[in-house]
Amino acid sequence: MSEGPKGLAIAAPASGSGKTTLTLGLLRALTRRGLRVQPFKNGPDYIDPAFHAAAAGRASFNLDGWAMDRPQLHALAGQAAGADLVIFEGAMGLYDGPADPGRSGRGTSAEIARMFGWPVVLVLDVKGQGQSAAATALGFARHPEAPPLAGVILNHVASPRHEAMIRAEMDRLGLRVLGALPRRSDLSLPERHLGLVQAEEQAGLEATLEALADFVAAHVDLEALLSVAGAGPAPGAGAWAVPPAGRIALARDAAFSFVYPHMLEAWRRAGVTVLPFSPLADQAPDPSADLVWLPGGYPELHAGRIAAATRFKAGLRAFAETRSVHGECGGYMVLGARLVDAEGRAHAMAGLLGLVTSYEKRRLHLGYRSADLLAPLPGYGAGSRLYGHEFHYSTILEQPDAPLAKVCDAAGAPVAETGSVRGHVTGSFFHLIAG
């Protein structure tokens, strides 16, 4: 049986342990050595894959065991063909995921690592502890669902004495230390309410990536790291999503940037013509398109400019008279009547739906979603079940149109954010991952 690509899973006991910092440093450091490194990210995160791509020079893809079936996961893993190494960054803690399983499991980083045979490098934030860090690592290694543990990398090490103390206990317990990162507050990446500030907004990103690569190369044994990479069987037969149209006008700018790389790759493979346009530059969608797609992003940060984008809104309305328009999360809000910003100012949106949303009183909406369509959505008929993710802080003030879907959380409980449909226009707060 042929092997899949060799790889490593970068995981941790919890969020905030330093996975992304280490991953970006590794991607750039190994790429500088001439290796072709294929990055992946566990779960539905939009932002980390864009940083991965900047660091590695090739697209990073989400591997989501809750929302994706195995053929889709295998198709995406096949993107590593020709690479020398896979670096798979986990999400949250190694075993964290919804309590109720989805399509291929609970969406944990451990499940994906086991599926593709990638040993785990466990990142441990050792600030405020000593030998107890080894007990944490040992517990993770002995978990009944544990993938092979290749070793650990210590983060936020206070001093050489601190490092030596922890290394000695790791050695005693038979755990391999692959590196120790000292405290460096100047290498953190800025954050926004949905996570890191996006890669394209990061001033001096190249310099940051180079600094991270230097830092990781100085404190991680890269040769030892490469020696413990592993692989399982080659990915099985894959399946790519069928695109919703042949010519898609796609909004792409600072307000509309949350597009999953796997969706764009599926469109590319099917020969779709993508026609990008910028609402912030007051550009109307290409009238030759079959479909307009408004992805999510940060429209609340640009609400005034969107409200003033008369050519964009007029072109969108004209398009919607005869052809399909769909919006996700931020795109859904822009299709609505009004968006109220954090200061209480109301901004007129496209008015193709009656939706009114507000950021004046922020409320977190977060989690996986399944959606049983009550009306057709581009590419899917009524009755189809879709899988996605919701993450925003807006509040619905009015949602008067017919519901697009019956939407439930990962536990199967209905949620109020049903989406909307009016004529050729559809929208939802959940970001579609797979159907």
UniProtKB/Swiss-Prot annotation:
Any Pfam family: CbiA
Task: Name the reaction it catalyses.
Answer: hydrogenobyrinate + 2 L-glutamine + 2 ATP + 2 H2O = hydrogenobyrinate a,c-diamide + 2 L-glutamate + 2 ADP + 2 phosphate + 2 H(+)
Query: Its pathway?
Result: Cofactor biosynthesis; adenosylcobalamin biosynthesis; cob(II)yrinate a,c-diamide from precorrin-2 (aerobic route): step 9/10
Choose any GO biological process term that the UniProt entry carries and state it.
cobalamin biosynthetic process
The record's function comment reads:
Catalyzes the ATP-dependent amidation of the two carboxylate groups at positions a and c of hydrogenobyrinate, using either L-glutamine or ammonia as the nitrogen source.
Q: Which family does it belong to?
A: Belongs to the CobB/CbiA family.
Extra info from the record? The a and c carboxylates of hydrogenobyrinate are activated for nucleophilic attack via formation of a phosphorylated intermediate by ATP. CobB catalyzes first the amidation of the c-carboxylate, and then that of the a-carboxylate.
Please state what the annotation says regarding this protein's domains: Comprises of two domains. The C-terminal domain contains the binding site for glutamine and catalyzes the hydrolysis of this substrate to glutamate and ammonia. The N-terminal domain is anticipated to bind ATP and hydrogenobyrinate and catalyzes the ultimate synthesis of the diamide product. The ammonia produced via the glutaminase domain is probably translocated to the adjacent domain via a molecular tunnel, where it reacts with an activated intermediate.
Q: Which protein is depicted? A: Hydrogenobyrinate a,c-diamide synthase
